[in-house]
Design a protein with these regions (language model features):
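Acidic, glycine-rich loop-and-beta core segments that form the ion-binding/anion-interacting portion
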Residues: 31-65, 72-74
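Peripheral docking tails and interdomain loops at the edges
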Residues: 155, 160-214
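Redox- and metal-dependent alpha/beta enzyme cores, enriched for Fe-S-associated oxidoreductases
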Residues: 59-124, 128-133
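Proline-aspartate-enriched helix->loop->beta-strand connector
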Residues: 136, 140-146
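Short, structured coil segments at secondary-structure junctions
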Residues: 7, 74, 169-172
């Protein structure tokens, strides 16, 4: 059983705070962040957890909490999100070098360290795959769901590459999803997510049996 005090869909809703914290003066946003932290300290874990596996959600723009709720209703707890303006990346420290303005430091940081799929160099692509693999390892995820909004060409190509490279090079199962910006095919998506959860459960059972026999 997987228990948690904070589910991925709540993180998706809270990403409004995440976005504001990047552009809002600290004195305005800190009270809300402290309030969220205190709430988590006293919150009890779910009495009857519905989650059977852990997944990382990666992909293009996603500001629809219902999409994450749909994933979690199928038994997959979203333990980390890595989409265009999700929780990850974006929390790394930006160094202001000597003689550099804050604006220039921010611009340099995003140009040099961006993990946006618009950067097509092989080294940048490899770095993005490794980043997702590292996040999955850190949060003990069983697999990755990679989504792209229809007509988002950058993530359409990236999603195909992730589907091949993450399982082959990092041993991470991937569920590849193309979706509308507004979710209108919940029935089809639910079937895909349920099948993915079942495949992850089978993989975990096989690994346990292999460990016993080994």
């Amino acid at each position: 059983e997987i228990t948690t005090r904070l589910v991925g869909s709540e993180m998706c809703i809270r990403d409004s705070i995440n976005l504001v914290s990047m552009v809002c003066p600290k004195y305005l946003i800190l009270p809300y962040l402290r309030e969220t932290l205190e709430d988590l300290k006293t919150r009890e874990a779910d009495a009857k957890p519905n989650y059977r596996v852990k997944v990382v959600l990666a992909g293009s723009e996603n500001d629809d909490p219902d999409f994450t709720k749909l994933i979690e209703s199928c038994g997959a707890l979203v333990v980390a999100d890595r989409y265009c303006y999700g929780s990850l990346p974006g929390r790394e420290k930006i160094e202001i070098r000597k003689g550099e303005t804050a604006l220039r430091a921010v611009a340099r940081h995003y140009l040099e360290t961006s993990v946006c799929p618009r950067s097509m160099e092989q080294s940048a692509m490899r770095q993005r795959k490794k980043y997702i693999a590292d996040v999955a390892k850190e949060y003990k995820a069983d697999g990755v769901i990679v989504e792209s909004n229809k007509f988002c060409e950058y993530w359409s190509y990236e999603r195909v590459a992730d589907t091949i490279i993450l399982p082959r090079d990092f041993g991470l199962p991937v569920c590849s999803i193309e979706k509308e910006y507004i979710n209108s095919a919940s029935g089809q998506l639910r079937t895909r997510f349920q099948a993915f959860v079942e495949s992850l459960e089978i993989k975990k059972i096989q690994e346990k049996e292999g460990a016993k026999n080994g």
